C-alpha cells in the first residue's frame, strides 16, 4: 500500500547536490511536512507514494534553492543611486548620509522588494546585515523566504541603535523572539574592523557565545581597510581578528579580498566560512578574492550578491556566472573555477555560511527548499550538461517555481504571499523619499 505524502514533484532533470553530485533524469521527489521524504526514478516514487498534490514539471530542471551568503536586502532602495565610486567614497558620501534618515517603513518595503527579486530568481535563503533588522525579518516572514541576519553593530550611533550595547541587546531579543521560527535565524553582526573597536568586537563575541549565535562581519574587503587596521592596531585585519578571538567555525567573513596565503592558512585552521561577493568587489574595484587558494585549503566558501547598491541586483544566477568568468580571466586559467565548484558555492557553501548544513541539497531528510527552471527556454537548448547551463547560460528569468519548506512562494509569475503590484506602488513612494534625502546632502 502506497504511503501518503503532501506533494510529489516530477521533473525532467533533478540536480541533487548530494555527496555524489547525482543528477537524476525523469525523476521525482516526495515531500511531507516541509521535508523531502523520498527521491528517485519517477516509477519508483509513484509506486510507493500517493500525494495530496502532484506537480508535473516534465520540461523542467529541479535543483536546491540558491543561498545568498552575504547581502543587505533592504538596500534595494539604493539601486543605481551612486555608481562608479570607490568603496570608502561610496560609503561616506552617499550610503552612510542617506542611511541616517532611514525609517522602519522604508526598510520594510525595500526588504520585501529584495525578497521578491530573490524568490523570482531562485534564491530561498540569505545572510543579511542591516538596520531595523526586526523589520527585515518581518518582511522575510511576509515573503516566506529564509533569512539569517542581525542588527548592524557599530562603535558610533546608527539610525536604529544609539550604541553598540543597544544593538547587541536588540540582537539578543530577536534571538529569543525567533528561537522557534524555522525560517528566521539570528547572527551577531559587527559591521567591520574599521567601524568598531576591540571593545565592541569583544562584546560581540561574548553575546555570540552567550546566546550560541554565529557571527558575521565584513573583513579584508579593500587595501584601504588593511591600511586603517595597520595604522590603528599595528595588525592586518585577519591577525587583528584572530587575536581578538573572532575567528571560529561559527564565523562567516564577507569579502576577504586583501589577504595573503599565510592569512588564508590561518582562516582555514580556525574553520571560518568565507562569503565571496565578486560583482560588488568588481564594481567597487575592491580587488579579487583568492577563491582558488581558499578551496585548496578546504575553506568553505559561499557566494553572495552584497546589497543592490553595489551590485546592482540580488540575482544569484548572474552572480554565479560572473564568479566563474572573473576567476578564469583574473588567474589566466580557464580551469581556475569549474562550473560545479561555483554551483557548490551557491548551494552547499551558502548553507555553511548561514550555518544550516541541511540546506543546499536535495535528499531525504532535508528541507524541501528547491526551485524549478524552464529548460525549454531558447538560451537553455540543447542541454548536454545541466551544470554548465546553470552557470554559463541561465539568467534567473527561467525560474518557474520557488519553494521553501515545501511551500510554493513563487509560481509562474505570481508571488503567493504578497501582491507584487502593491509592493511596486510602495517602492515608487520610497523612490521619492530617496530623492528628497539626496537634496539634503
Curated annotation (Swiss-Prot):
Q: Could you say which residues bind substrate here?
A: 99, 191, 221, 306
UniProt catalytic activity: S-adenosyl-L-homocysteine + H2O + H(+) = S-inosyl-L-homocysteine + NH4(+); S-methyl-5'-thioadenosine + H2O + H(+) = S-methyl-5'-thioinosine + NH4(+)
Q: Which domain of life is it from?
A: Bacteria
Its top-level enzyme class, in one word, is hydrolase
**Could you tell me the keywords of this UniProt record?**
Hydrolase, Metal-binding, Zinc
InterPro entries, per database record:
Amidohydro-rel (IPR006680), Deaminase_MtaD/DadD (IPR023512), Metal-dep_hydrolase_composite (IPR011059), Metal_Hydrolase (IPR032466), MTA/SAH_deaminase (IPR050287)
Residue sites binding Zn(2+) per the record: 70, 72, 218, 306
One Pfam family, please name it.
Amidohydro_1
What cofactor does its activity depend on?
Answer: Zn(2+)
Question: According to its UniProt record, which protein family does this protein belong to?
Answer: Belongs to the metallo-dependent hydrolases superfamily. MTA/SAH deaminase family.
Protein name (database record): 5-methylthioadenosine/S-adenosylhomocysteine deaminase
Task: Quote the gene name from the UniProt entry.
Answer: mtaD
Amino acid at each position: 500500500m502506497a504511503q501518503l505524502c503532501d506533494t510529489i514533484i516530477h521533473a525532467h532533470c533533478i540536480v541533487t547536490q548530494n555527496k555524489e553530485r547525482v543528477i537524476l533524469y525523469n525523476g521525482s521527489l516526495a515531500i511531507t511536512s516541509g521535508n523531502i521524504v523520498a527521491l528517485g526514478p519517477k516509477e519508483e516514487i509513484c509506486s510507493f507514494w500517493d500525494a495530496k498534490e502532484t506537480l508535473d514539471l516534465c520540461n523542467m530542471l529541479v535543483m536546491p534553492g540558491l543561498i545568498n551568503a552575504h547581502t543587505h536586502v533592504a538596500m534595494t532602495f539604493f539601486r543605481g543611486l551612486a555608481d562608479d565610486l570607490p568603496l570608502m567614497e561610496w560609503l561616506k558620501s552617499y550610503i552612510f548620509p542617506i542611511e541616517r534618515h532611514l525609517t522602519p517603513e522604508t526598510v520594510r518595503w525595500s526588504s520585501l522588494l529584495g525578497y521578491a527579486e530573490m524568490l523570482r530568481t531562485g534564491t530561498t535563503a540569505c545572510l543579511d546585515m542591516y538596520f531595523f533588522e526586526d523589520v527585515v525579518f518581518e518582511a522575510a516572514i511576509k515573503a516566506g523566504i529564509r533569512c539569517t541576519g542581525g542588527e548592524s553593530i557599530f562603535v558610533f550611533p546608527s539610525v536604529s541603535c544609539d550604541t553598540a550595547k543597544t544593538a547587541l541587546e536588540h540582537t539578543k531579543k530577536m534571538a529569543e523572539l525567533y528561537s522557534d521560527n524555522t525560517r528566521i535565524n539570528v547572527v551577531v553582526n559587527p559591521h567591520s574592523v574599521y567601524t568598531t573597536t576591540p571593545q565592541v568586537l569583544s562584546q560581540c563575541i561574548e553575546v555570540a557565545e552567550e546566546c550560541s549565535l554565529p557571527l558575521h562581519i565584513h573583513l579584508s574587503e579593500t587595501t584601504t581597510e588593511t591600511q586603517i587596521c595597520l595604522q590603528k592596531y599595528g595588525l592586518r585585519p585577519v591577525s587583528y581578528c584572530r587575536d581578538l578571538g573572532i575567528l571560529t567555525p561559527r564565523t562567516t567573513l564577507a569579502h576577504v579580498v586583501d589577504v595573503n596565503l599565510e592569512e588564508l592558512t590561518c582562516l582555514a585552521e580556525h574553520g571560518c566560512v568565507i562569503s565571496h561577493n565578486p560583482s560588488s568587489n568588481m564594481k567597487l574595484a575592491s580587488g579579487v578574492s583568492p577563491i582558488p587558494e581558499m578551496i585548496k585549503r578546504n575553506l568553505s566558501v559561499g557566494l553572495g550578491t552584497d546589497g543592490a547598491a553595489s551590485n546592482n541586483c540580488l540575482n544569484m544566477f548572474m552572480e554565479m556566472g560572473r564568479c566563474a568568468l572573473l576567476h578564469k580571466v583574473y588567474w589566466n586559467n580557464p580551469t581556475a573555477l569549474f562550473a560545479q565548484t561555483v554551483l557548490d558555492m551557491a548551494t552547499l557553501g551558502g548553507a555553511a555560511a548561514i550555518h544550516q548544513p541541511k540546506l543546499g541539497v536535495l535528499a531525504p531528510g532535508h528541507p524541501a527548499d528547491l526551485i524549478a527552471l524552464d529548460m525549454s527556454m531558447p538560451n537553455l537548448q540543447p542541454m548536454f550538461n545541466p551544470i554548465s547551463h546553470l552557470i554559463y547560460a541561465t539568467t534567473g528569468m527561467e525560474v518557474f517555481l520557488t519553494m521553501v519548506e515545501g511551500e510554493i512562494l513563487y509560481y509562474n509569475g505570481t508571488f503567493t504571499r504578497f501582491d507584487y503590484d502593491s509592493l511596486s506602488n510602495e517602492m515608487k513612494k520610497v523612490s521619492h523619499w530617496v530623492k528628497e534625502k539626496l537634496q539634503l546632502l
